[in-house]
Design a protein with these regions (language model features):
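Generic protein-terminus/edge-of-domain signal
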Residues: 1-60, 64-67
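A hydrophobic/aromatic-rich effector-binding and dimerization subdomain
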Residues: 2-21, 85-145
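Residues immediately flanking
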Residues: 54, 78, 97-99
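Short acidic-glycine-tyrosine-enriched beta hairpin
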Residues: 63-77
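Short beta-strand His + acidic residue motifs that chelate non-heme Fe in jelly-roll/DSBH
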Residues: 58-60, 76, 81-87, 93
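Well-ordered beta-strand positions in beta-sheet-rich domains
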Residues: 65-67, 81, 126
Length: 145
C-alpha cells in the first residue's frame, strides 16, 4: 500500500525536510507543536529516526505495538503507519530526512543505512542502545544541530 492509497484512511504528513535534507526536533516540543495528532495513526513521506531518551509506553508501527523505554531508537521509512500512545511522557530526539537524503546508493555506508537499518525485513524497526552509546549519540546529535 503506497502513501496515495492511505489518503483518507490515515492522516498523511508529507512535509518533508527541506534545505540540507534533514531536520532535528526534540520531544516533547515538536510533538506539542505538531499540526497533527501523533497519538492517531499517521503516515509521512520521509525517513525518521526517533530516539526515546526518557519515558516509557508503546509506539505502534505498522499495526504492531513496541515497548518504548529509554534508549529505544526507531527507524521509520516513508509510508509506514505509526503513532504514540501518549506524547506528553516522552523526551528524546527526532531526525527527519527527505527521501533525496537517502538516495545515494553508491556509498556502502549509505546502502547499509538504507537497507540494513531502515528497510530491514528480518528485524523489528528499532534498536536499544546502552548508556555509553547514548552519551556518544548525544554528542553526534549536538554536532548535527
Amino acid at each position: 500500500m503506497n502513501t496515495e492509497q492511505l489518503e483518507g484512511r490515515y492522516q498523511t504528513v508529507c512535509a518533508a525536510p527541506s534545505g540540507n535534507g534533514f531536520r532535528i526536533g526534540h520531544m516533547p516540543d515538536f510533538l506539542m507543536r505538531s499540526d497533527i495528532n501523533d497519538c492517531a495513526p499517521h503516515v509521512h513521506a520521509f525517513y525518521e529516526i526517533l530516539w526515546f531518551q526518557q519515558g516509557e509506553g508503546i509506539h505502534t508501527v505498522d499495526f504492531t505495538d513496541y515497548e518504548v523505554k529509554p534508549g529505544t531508537i526507531f527507524f521509520l521509512t516513508p509510508g509506514q503507519i505509526h503513532h504514540f500512545d501518549d506524547k506528553e511522557r516522552y523526551h528524546g530526539v527526532s531526525i527527519k530526512m527527505c527521501t533525496d537524503f537517502m538516495r545515494d546508493e553508491k556509498d556502502p555506508g549509505s546502502l547499509s543505512l538504507k537497507y540494513d537499518i531502515f528497510h530491514a525485513f528480518d528485524a523489528p524497526p528499532y534498536y536499544i542502545i546502552d548508556a555509553d552509546t547514548a552519551v556518544t549519540l548525544g554528542r553526534i546529535v549536538e554536532a548535527m544541530e
